[in-house]
């Protein structure tokens, strides 16, 4: 592995040639899920380097100087200058930003972390402080001007933005906007492959229910495959961005509701003002798409989605996926299984599973 920090920094824990790494992950999935699926696993590889568009680094203070750090294998902090996994824009910006911080006492004082976000259109550095950021407002504004990037500063629930707080990314032919604190895929190329996998999983689509939709990562491309889409998300900012992202699509309905609230609405347990303009009885669902957090799908949601003929499940945690499949495979059969290698040089695995009754 061509990184001088491997073995010291805990950011990577697999030191294998890339094809061997893919074999390691594939063999793990075959063994872990053999009771549910014995077919071929579709493999979607990543670039080995410069694939990550989003990361946070610690800041270490020593004798008036500052350094980037990562957590070490023994929980100590490891000084680093760069990270070869990062997008090239981040790699280029890291030393420039650090030099400007070193030259400005106000900016480096009580700074404890920096988060970088690089998209095809925007670049943002988020500076994390243990002090009143309003006292360094002018310094931050000047920093954004010098580096010609978006700068955000945060401390104790307060924040300042210079250059705008919205980021834009192009995935396939779609433009997505999102806030810096929203969840978004950190490997854009593999995300595009995930979207293609989902698109190819749709046959004879009528209407789609999408749960945990975020800012519409899958929703926008899927709009052309279905008559109508109903998509839920609990995050207010994500729903706001999803609606903005889909303003040219007239067959998508986004609702800010939890999965359990949406199920209550379908079951007639409660009426929700948020659904007053949407007739949920007017949908003819052929598919449900779920992309839950690491904890997986809640029991009541599992019971609910078993009513659908076709389930598309995107998982960021094989352990919770396996638990959920114990239930789903009582009524459904897996027809496709995919490995998305979002995080190269780590044991992290993301999966896509298609189930049918």
UniProtKB/Swiss-Prot annotation:
User: Record's SUPFAM superfamilies?
Assistant: S-adenosyl-L-methionine-dependent methyltransferases
Catalysed transformations (reactions)? uridine(54) in tRNA + S-adenosyl-L-methionine = 5-methyluridine(54) in tRNA + S-adenosyl-L-homocysteine + H(+); uridine(341) in tmRNA + S-adenosyl-L-methionine = 5-methyluridine(341) in tmRNA + S-adenosyl-L-homocysteine + H(+)
Q: What Pfam families is this protein classified in? A: tRNA_U5-meth_tr (PF05958)
Report the EC code(s) recorded for this entry. 2.1.1.-, 2.1.1.35
Supply the CDD domains for this chain: AdoMet_MTases
- The positions annotated for binding S-adenosyl-L-methionine are 185, 212, 217, 233, 291
Example of a GO cellular component annotation carried by this entry = cytosol
* Family matches, as InterPro entries: MeTrfase_TrmA_AS (IPR030390), SAM-dependent_MTases_sf (IPR029063), TrmA_MeTrfase (IPR011869), U5_MeTrfase_fam (IPR010280)
Its BP terms in the Gene Ontology are: methylation; tRNA processing
Molecular function GO labels: rRNA binding; tRNA (uracil(54)-C5)-methyltransferase activity, S-adenosyl methionine-dependent; tRNA binding
Asked if the Swiss-Prot or TrEMBL record annotates the protein with the keyword Cytoplasm, the reply is no
Q: Looking at its record, which EC class is this enzyme?
A: transferase
**Keyword line:** Methyltransferase, S-adenosyl-L-methionine, Transferase, tRNA processing
Where does the record place the catalytic residues? Answer: 316, 350
Top-level taxon: Bacteria
PROSITE patterns from the UniProt entry:
SAM_MT_RNA_M5U, TRMA_1
Q: What does the function comment of this entry state?
A: Dual-specificity methyltransferase that catalyzes the formation of 5-methyluridine at position 54 (m5U54) in all tRNAs, and that of position 341 (m5U341) in tmRNA (transfer-mRNA).
The record's family statement is: Belongs to the class I-like SAM-binding methyltransferase superfamily. RNA M5U methyltransferase family. TrmA subfamily.
Protein name, as recorded = tRNA/tmRNA (uracil-C(5))-methyltransferase
Q: Which organism is it from?
A: Campylobacter hominis (strain ATCC BAA-381 / DSM 21671 / CCUG 45161 / LMG 19568 / NCTC 13146 / CH001A)
């Amino acid at each position: 592995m061509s990184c001088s920090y491997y073995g010291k920094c805990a950011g990577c824990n697999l030191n294998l040639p890339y094809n061997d790494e893919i074999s390691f992950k594939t063999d793990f999935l075959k063994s872990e899920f053999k009771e549910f699926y014995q077919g071929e696993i579709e493999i979607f590889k990543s670039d080995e380097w410069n694939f990550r568009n989003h990361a946070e680094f610690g800041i270490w203070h020593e004798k008036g100087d500052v350094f980037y750090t990562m957590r070490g294998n023994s929980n100590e902090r490891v000084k680093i200058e760069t990270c070869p996994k990062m997008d090239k824009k981040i790699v280029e910006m890291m030393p420039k930003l650090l030099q400007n911080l070193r030259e400005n006492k106000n900016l480096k004082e009580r700074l404890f972390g920096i988060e970088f976000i690089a998209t095809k259109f925007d670049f943002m550095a988020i500076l994390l402080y243990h002090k009143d950021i309003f006292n360094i407002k002018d310094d931050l504004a000047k920093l954004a001007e010098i580096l010609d990037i978006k700068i955000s500063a945060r401390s104790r629930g307060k924040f300042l933005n210079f250059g705008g707080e919205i980021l834009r990314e192009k995935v396939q032919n779609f433009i997505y906007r999102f806030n810096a604190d929203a969840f978004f895929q950190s490997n854009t190329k593999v995300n595009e492959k995930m979207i293609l996998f989902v698109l190819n999983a749709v046959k004879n689509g009528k209407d789609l229910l999408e749960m945990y939709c975020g800012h519409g990562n899958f929703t926008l491309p899927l709009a052309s495959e279905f008559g109508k889409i109903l998509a839920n998300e609990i995050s207010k900012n994500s729903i706001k961005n999803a609606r903005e992202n889909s303003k040219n699509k007239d067959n998508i309905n986004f609702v800010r509701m939890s999965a359990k609230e949406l199920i209550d609405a379908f079951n007639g347990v409660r009426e929700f003002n948020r659904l007053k303009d949407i007739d949920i009885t007017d949908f003819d669902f052929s598919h449900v798409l779920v992309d839950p957090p690491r904890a997986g799908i809640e029991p009541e949601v599992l019971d609910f989605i078993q009513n659908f003929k076709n389930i598309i499940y995107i998982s960021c945690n094989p352990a919770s996926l396996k638990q959920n499949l114990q239930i789903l495979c009582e009524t459904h059969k897996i027809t496709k299984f995919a490995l998305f290698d979002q995080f190269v040089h780590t044991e992290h695995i993301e999966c896509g599973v298609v189930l049918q009754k």
